[in-house]
UniProtKB/Swiss-Prot annotation:
The gene is rpsZ. Belongs to the universal ribosomal protein uS14 family. Zinc-binding uS14 subfamily. Part of the 30S ribosomal subunit. Contacts proteins S3 and S10. It comes from Clostridium botulinum (strain 657 / Type Ba4). Its cofactor is Zn(2+). One of its GO terms (molecular function) is rRNA binding. This is Small ribosomal subunit protein uS14. The lineage of its organism: Bacteria, Bacillati, Bacillota, Clostridia, Eubacteriales. It comes from the Bacteria.
Length: 61
């Protein structure tokens, strides 16, 4: 319930632009969000393993 409320609060435009912060579009996690994709590292990893992110593959060297 608290996470849903935070997501709703995040969707509103803030009074001042400095109050805006990134949040994962899938799970709502506020930390470790990749700006390019708009999702957190955990969701990114899951989607990358499933092959749902085009052009992304596991690095190996």
């Amino acid at each position: 319930m608290a996470r849903k409320a935070l997501i709703e609060k995040w969707n509103k435009t803030p009074k001042y632009s400095t109050r805006a912060y990134t949040r994962c579009r899938i799970c709502g996690r506020p930390h470790a969000v990749l700006k390019k994709y708009g999702i957190c590292r955990i969701c990114f990893r899951e989607l990358a393993y499933k092959g749902e992110i085009p052009g992304c593959k596991k690095a190996s060297w």
